[in-house]
């Protein structure tokens, strides 16, 4: 599911891992993750990276996996084509303009990745790879007429043609590739699918995102093995009732279309676990959808619901729920039945009172309430003992809500106020959030920070941009894990003298501050220049202190009175004080008689 946001906002990266991203949400796909891990293990276990062209002795007849990606290759090296036992070949992200005839030697190759190269034509010999199961030609400016070669690859199970400029799919591909299970066609210019697509009876996944479909391709509804359909970012106005025939469908992505309603028959897709309806024009859901009891992820953001659909509260298996920008004013009492929720996005709504129903969701780990009208938090928020990320940016909080300090698992807090009320202080009790790693408190009216920040050992990111800070507490130098300190647009004129002790600090921003120490020209040179300036300052100060102590000792030993008296006398223009014998002390060395 895709959500965007400006500024610091609390949103989800991948569902089950439950980590935050800014500003985009991505799907969590355990299958893809497993494939990635498997690929990496193979890479580590069997062969160093391919080229290896410089060390050809490392390539042997028994080599079956090779990675030549990101090498700047313009052709496929003959050394690779000579490896007849190769099963998996990665040549993506190069500058390869043509496939040589020798490609036909790779008769045992099952996986061939050539995406993001400069291929236009495909040589006929490519069609001779009789063992090939997975082919990726994405991101190449392919000539459509050359794709007929692909139809000869009868063993193909996965074919990816993303971003290849396709305006149509060659019918030969759909007629001949009867074993195809995954068909990737996203980011092209397709308006329809050939009717021969019905021959793909083994197809499990089809990706058609970012094309020009105005009508749902109904032929998909007879492909009964389909588990994943991705039609995000098209121009669909409706979904046919025949969608109910896809009883094995598990993931259905139709975000960013022009849908106004859903068919009742969608309820027959009883295995559906992910339903993304984000950014459509849906006002209500058919009551029959309450039968979709296996749903774990639902996206309704960007629709004008105004109320939480009653049936939604029956989806008790939900882990992730996106209700961003849906014109909500509150939640139903039955919302507390969603006890398995881990992520809840209620941002950009019209919520004035924190929904207490949320406090019953004890498994909740991420809560986004950004850009609402919430004024205070209830004490019962302490029941959210597993909450790790809380987004409250852009609300009408009258003061920093101390109820937050009861959230013992909190790791990231977003409470910047780019709109709504501004906070004037950050309580010393912030130290109670011992697990806090990131604190975003930008766009407020803070004039100072609490010294207790130095007692937060896990703090890594502190965003205080656009406040009224005049100085930083010296204690901040003890937050040894701090990686980012964002201070631009404040009233700072100096930095703590030991700030360079923050050895993990990689990002320090000081723009739009009236800096004097270090001066602006030093600040503009970056961290190293700032650290050097602070160290030199300490050395100068230490030397001045040493000289002062030495001179004070001399004055006292010579009997000229205390150092302070001497300073006072000089400031008033008087003569130096007399020594103990009543004689006036000389300006230079003391007389021998005065020596003790």
Swiss-Prot record:
It comes from the Eukaryota. Keywords: Leucine-rich repeat, Repeat. Coiled coil: none annotated. Pfam families: IQ, LRR_1, LRR_14, LRR_8. CDD domains: IQCG. InterPro entries: IQ_motif_EF-hand-BS, Leu-rich_rpt, Leu-rich_rpt_typical-subtyp, LRR_dom_sf, LRR_R13L4/SHOC2-like, LRRC69/RLP. This is Leucine-rich repeat and IQ domain-containing protein 4. SUPFAM superfamilies: L domain-like (SSF52058). Residues 540-569 form the IQ domain. Residues 569-596 are annotated as: Disordered. It comes from Mus musculus (Mouse). Residues 569-587 have a biased composition (Basic residues). LRR repeats lie at residues 22-44, 59-83, 84-106, 108-129, 130-152, 153-176, 177-200, 202-223, 224-246, 248-269, 270-293, 295-315, 317-337, 338-361, 362-384, 385-407, 410-433, 434-457, 459-479, 480-502, 504-525, 527-549.
